[in-house]
A protein has these predicted regions:
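N-terminal glycine-rich phosphate-binding loop for ADP-containing cofactors
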Residues: 1-411
Length: 411
């Protein structure tokens, strides 16, 4: 017998930037929210930050005083998991460490009522590995919010191997209630958005070693219509997030593509928040300023790694970044991680600043045509190696004269 799930009482674990945004999303949508963090001082600071955000919204005329007070009143700090027993939904929003998340889910599984749904805000970790430590894997899923969560509209809803259809339906209803654009993704490393971001960012980073400079790569992509290029994006998000994740996992720090990032982080240049990353920022400013010190660093790293440098045209920068996105998107589509190409486009239009006029990476690729796409990928494979091997789906579409938009997997 299928069970229906309705979310009235929610809870959030984690009082960092993501936790704060998620709490506001839930409170803004009319849910009562309990909030827990292992550091009471951090939780108090986060409550203050939420109050400040609501006060700012009142000053801006976005909401009235009464509505701000009502939203604040829906948020209740708690000191232990037992206080969350009656929650219908708990969203974990701690930092990206699988063992930590598994530990939290074990405790939640033991403490919460049997009907509660457990969600992780992980941006790339294995949802099935998290669900496996509970006795309720059918009631575990990913709810990947994008930062800042109370502003960004995209929500990736990640279905695990055992996630019940009714749980997915409840999550979609919650997304609609919060005013989100929701996309259901299958479980894999990075899901849809961040899995595709990895080869895109890798190409951008490798082009630095081969002869391009950060401002040049960003300029080419912004001229195409991206809200910001990859290096400006990493400055906003924080260069140190991936750096710390690599350190924690003990994997990937020796890859040539991340050596400029590593040097920047070792210098304390974490991005906008530290006043310097790939760009410089004046005190209190978000305006990115070209920094010749970073250009010199790129040249030193490339020389140390033995990369011969050459001139780059904007067209090559654009092609390598876009085709990296599309080739990975084709694999995601073929594997059933995304049900349709339009879902991939929705993710990139609403979460990654892809130009709306282009319709998303897969729509852009369909206009190019599968045969042309395959030809360009084969050229890049010959020139740069196996990472450019065309996705099997692209080969099939080229042979059949088909398009990504023709494909749709019934769910």
């Amino acid at each position: 017998m299928s069970q229906n799930f309705s979310f009235r009482q929610a809870a959030v674990i984690g009082a960092g930037t993501m936790g704060r945004g998620i709490v506001m999303c839930l409170a803004n949508a009319g849910l009562d929210v309990q909030w827990l963090d292992s550091n009471p001082q951090m939780l108090n600071q986060a409550l203050g930050a939420v109050a400040d955000t609501y006060a700012h919204n009142v000053r801006q005329g976005r909401i009235g005083e009464e509505e701000a007070a009502a939203r604040r009143a829906r948020i209740t700090p708690v000191q232990h998991l037992a206080a969350m027993r009656e929650a219908d939904l708990v969203i974990e929003a701690v930092y990206e460490n699988l063992e930590l998340k598994q530990s939290i889910f074990r405790e939640l599984d033991a403490a919460l009522k049997p009907s509660a749904v457990l969600a992780s805000n992980t941006s790339y970790l294995d949802i099935d590995a998290i669900a496996a430590v509970t006795a309720r894997p059918r009631q575990v899923l990913g709810l990947h919010f994008f930062s800042p969560a109370h502003i960004m509209r995209l929500l990736e809803i990640v279905r695990g191997a055992q996630t019940a259809p009714a749980v997915l339906e409840a999550a979609l209803a919650l997304g609609e209630r919060m005013g989100k654009v929701s996309v259901v993704a299958g479980n894999c490393h990075g899901f849809i958005g961040n899995r595709m971001l990895e080869p895109y960012a890798t190409e951008a980073r490798l082009m630095l070693l081969e002869g391009a400079l950060p401002y040049q790569v960003d300029r080419a992509l912004q001229a195409f219509g991206f809200a910001m290029g990859p290096f400006r994006m990493y400055d906003v998000v924080g260069i140190d997030l991936e750096w710390r994740a690599r350190e924690l996992a003990g994997v990937g720090q020796d890859q040539p593509a991340v050596q400029v990032d590593n040097r920047l982080c070792e210098m304390g240049r974490f991005g906008q928040k530290s006043g310097a990353g790939y760009y410089r920022y004046a005190p209190g400013s978000r305006q990115a300023e070209h920094d010749t010190e970073v250009d010199a660093l790129v040249l030193r790293v490339a020389e140390t790694l033995g990369y011969p440098r050459r001139d780059f045209a904007d067209e090559e920068i654009l092609e390598r970044c876009l085709l990296a996105l599309v080739n990975e998107g084709a694999k995601i589509l073929d594997e059933g991680i995304a049900a349709r190409s339009a879902d991939i486009d929705t993710v990139y239009l609403n979460g990654y600043g892809f130009p709306a006029a282009e319709g998303g990476p897969m729509a852009w690729a369909d206009r190019l045509g599968a045969a042309e796409l395959l030809q360009r990928l084969r050229f890049l494979e010959q020139r740069h190696g196996a990472r450019w091997k065309p996705a099997s789906l692209i080969e099939r579409l080229a042979a059949e004269g088909g398009a990504f938009a023709d494909l749709q997997e019934a769910r």
